[in-house]
Amino acid sequence: MAEMIPAVPVNYEPITVPAGTAVGAAMREHELPNKGPEAVVVVRGADGTLYDLSHTPDTDAEFTPVAACEEDGRAVIRHSCGHVMAQAVQAEFPGTKLGIGPAIENGFYFDFQTAKPFTPEDLKAIEKRMKKIIKGGQRFERHVYASTEEAEAALANEPFKLELVQDKGNVDPDSDEAAEVGAGDLTHYDNVNPRTGEVEWFDLCRGPHVPTTKYIPAFTLTRSSAAYWRGDQTKAGLQRIYGTAFESKEALESYKTMVEEAEKRDHRRLGAELDLFSFPDEIGSGFPVFHPNGATVRMEMEEHSRRRHIADGYSFVSTPHLTKGDLFKKSGHLDFYADGMFPPMQLDGEWDADGYCTKQPQDYYAKPMNCPMHNLIFASRGRSYRELPLRLFEFGTVYRYEKSGVIHGLTRARGFTQDDSHIYCTPEQLEEELTKVLEFIISLLKDYGLDDFYLELSTKDPNKYVGSDEIWERSTAILQSVAEKSGLELVPDPAGAAFYGPKISVQARDAIGRTWQMSTVQLDFNLPERFELEYTASDGSKQRPIMIHRALFGSIERFFGVLLEHYAGAFPAWLAPHQVVGIPVADTFAPHLEKVCAELRSRGLRADVDTSDDRMQKKIRNHTTGKVPFMLLAGERDVEADAVSFRFLDGTQVNGVPVEAAVNVIEAWVRERNNEQPTKDSIAERV
């Protein structure tokens, strides 16, 4: 299986750097590597800020070395490689204007204003020039502009950079533009020729960067596309080049192999090949339609989840797709999330014969989230502490207006169904309930064949939160304790929480090592206040419940896409749309297989006989391509012995199995929800 070499924490010990000493010099004194995957490329300060190796502290300070093979190390290498690419582009295509160029997950991009789109031949020429720049060992040198005026003068020929300089202080710290300009000094990085000391190229940038271009040992440019300045379709059109870089050629090659495998597993491609779903233009972008094969898989996914939820004490509810706008005003969605909602429909207005409005219409919205309606269910009558925890669950379809450029098959759609739960509990119940929720999530995800997880803890953004510091600290400590007790790796996400509460995200790695965010467990201090939710405590007082948002799959559609890629289309037998197909050696043996399939259907299995005009070998190829886990063959000997022969997706067979034994084996395999594909060895030992 093709897996990318993951980022590996080296866990260097912090080093005290004396005032006035460059941190790079301190690293050399400690004889830390400057070559290879464990080479130190930047350092991390006590507050988490990354610094160049040229950074010189004003006072004695501790810094932790960051290796090239670590997540942050890779990001810095990619950011620096983006600068090299931009330098190469402007050298190859004089007059090109610079947009922004941040590191992103698994790579980087840079935007350019050019006379014409980039071609594949252009990318090859850019790569060739980049290799020359990297071989030259140019230094990355950080400089601070003395004033805004100095920056504007230096960037007079770069209109997009000038706009960023003029917007300084108004740039979203979470945006890609923040890599170029944000809080603090206005800085630029010069690419300096090590032999002559001349500045070969420079760019407005906050950094940090690797010391020299020789710290970029392996890179590739992957594609180009159209883009808009600052992602706004009303602004200038740009050309974007994507690339990636790694700490070693081996890591880059493993990434390329993974990408090739991922392309084969692309759920959009498999969805069409296996007749699972489609996206008709007549319906609109981002709205999938499930065909019989896909709907069967989806039904099995939902049914198993439904049974598990009932067994775990969840109460099923159902809410409408549309609601008055007042509800989302009350919940705060219209204040904080309006851009992600579809425009309102104005309904219930009345007009007289002359066209005068006698009753103002009301705004109705397609719901983007289920939580406000679940709160109305909680508030529909008085609640006692004896009813808590109350676990409401719904397969609730929601609608979110995603820009067309970010829609991606089933994994980023505009209409999708969440397996959405909202849990209301007392403060005393919170830790136990969170523990149960996390255990339930991991257990259920394992049922579907995912088994490699880690957790991410998103904590308070000090500039954007509701609720007291005390409740944030307590709830964050509880979440952290629950996460640590799970035994799973816990990765911090400082200041990554939504304004209304801390969150645990369950991240899952698939068969080729990619990470997918699966489930979220989100505490909410905001909505119980907005909806004035109350329960009667044991002493008769009215108290606010604590609310937990929990989406296990994220959405049915997205989880479907993840599983489809994880299994490369070969769903386990319990999920497969066609579990068994009978293939007669000749038409005369079809009635024998019809009886076998009828018995399987009577036991609740999906089984049919292929009676098409194709020859047997063609039928086997068709159903192997169609990923049918059990193919049953029958010829003269099988009929005489009241037997069948098994054929599996790997091409192996088990011949002459008595019908009763074959039916029992298949039924048991499916009932067990075995996530492995059946093979000669695994079935032979059962018959």
UniProtKB/Swiss-Prot annotation:
It is found in: Cytoplasm. Keywords: Aminoacyl-tRNA synthetase, ATP-binding, Cytoplasm, Ligase, Metal-binding, Nucleotide-binding, Protein biosynthesis, RNA-binding, tRNA-binding, Zinc. Binds 1 zinc ion per subunit. It catalyses: tRNA(Thr) + L-threonine + ATP = L-threonyl-tRNA(Thr) + AMP + diphosphate + H(+). Residues 266-572 are annotated as: Catalytic. It holds the Pfam family tRNA-synt_2b. Its EC number is 6.1.1.3. GO terms for cellular component: cytoplasm. Residues 1-67 form the TGS domain. Belongs to the class-II aminoacyl-tRNA synthetase family. Catalyzes the attachment of threonine to tRNA(Thr) in a two-step reaction: L-threonine is first activated by ATP to form Thr-AMP and then transferred to the acceptor end of tRNA(Thr). Also edits incorrectly charged L-seryl-tRNA(Thr). This is Threonine--tRNA ligase. It comes from Corynebacterium aurimucosum (strain ATCC 700975 / DSM 44827 / CIP 107346 / CN-1) (Corynebacterium nigricans).
